[in-house]
């Protein structure tokens, strides 16, 4: 391990996944969306770290965990420009950018109080209409919602 890696604000990771460029105010929402509180491996969370792009950012380092695209893309609703680094033996072997999926299942609450998903025990399902601006439409009642109106379940 080189000298400069020891000077990082958050310790280097031998193997696992680094989720970087998380807006600080969304960090704990991302933790919840990924279910990290249920994991047994080492997890390092950096909050309000200095960032040239964001001013302040969050970072999550998860030891020995490699997420599938479907797991990671869930966070695109709250943090659309997050970067993933896959680490093996202290080296970045792959970089990924979070992409919004075509559908969001059981992640978002429908804003329509009359929607069946708010009145029956069933999972929500939304179709993504506009990935750039995060506009989604409920599969059941067809109500559209924008990012600022979205409530995460």
UniProtKB/Swiss-Prot annotation:
Q: Does the keyword Metal-binding apply?
A: yes
Instruction: Report which residue ranges the record marks as coiled coil.
Output: none
Alphabetical GO biological process terms:
'de novo' pyrimidine nucleobase biosynthetic process; pyrimidine nucleotide biosynthetic process
Tell me the protein's name.
Aspartate carbamoyltransferase regulatory chain
- Recite the UniProt cofactor note for this protein: Binds 1 zinc ion per subunit.
What are the names of the required cofactors? Zn(2+)
Residues annotated to bind Zn(2+)? 110, 115, 138, 141
Subunit (UniProt): Contains catalytic and regulatory chains.
Is Iron found in the keyword set? no
InterPro entries found in the cross-reference section: Asp_carbamoyltransf_reg_N, Asp_carbamoylTrfase_reg, Asp_carbamoyltrfase_reg_C, Asp_carbatrfase_reg_C_sf, Asp_carbatrfase_reg_N_sf
What is the protein's known function?
A: Involved in allosteric regulation of aspartate carbamoyltransferase.
Q: Name one GO cellular component term.
A: aspartate carbamoyltransferase complex
Q: Which family does it belong to?
A: Belongs to the PyrI family.
- Quote the Gene3D superfamilies the UniProt record gives: Aspartate carbamoyltransferase regulatory subunit, C-terminal domain (2.30.30.20), Aspartate carbamoyltransferase regulatory subunit, N-terminal domain (3.30.70.140)
The molecular function terms of the Gene Ontology recorded here are: metal ion binding
* Record keywords: Metal-binding, Pyrimidine biosynthesis, Zinc
């Amino acid at each position: 391990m080189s000298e400069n890696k020891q000077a990082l604000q958050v310790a280097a990771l031998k193997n696992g996944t680094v989720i970087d460029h998380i807006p600080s105010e969304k960090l704990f929402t991302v933790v919840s969306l990924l279910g990290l509180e249920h994991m047994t491996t080492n997890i390092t969370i950096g909050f309000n770290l200095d960032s040239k792009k964001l001013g302040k950012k969050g970072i999550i380092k998860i030891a020995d965990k490699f997420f599938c695209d479907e797991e990671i893309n869930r966070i695109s609703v709250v943090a659309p420009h997050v970067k993933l680094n896959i680490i093996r033996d202290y080296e970045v072997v792959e970089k990924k950018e979070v992409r919004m999926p075509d559908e969001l299942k059981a992640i978002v609450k429908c804003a329509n109080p009359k929607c069946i998903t708010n009145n029956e025990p069933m999972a929500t399902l939304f179709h993504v209409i506009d990935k750039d601006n995060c506009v989604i439409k409920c599969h059941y009642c067809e109500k559209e919602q924008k990012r600022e109106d979205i409530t995460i379940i």
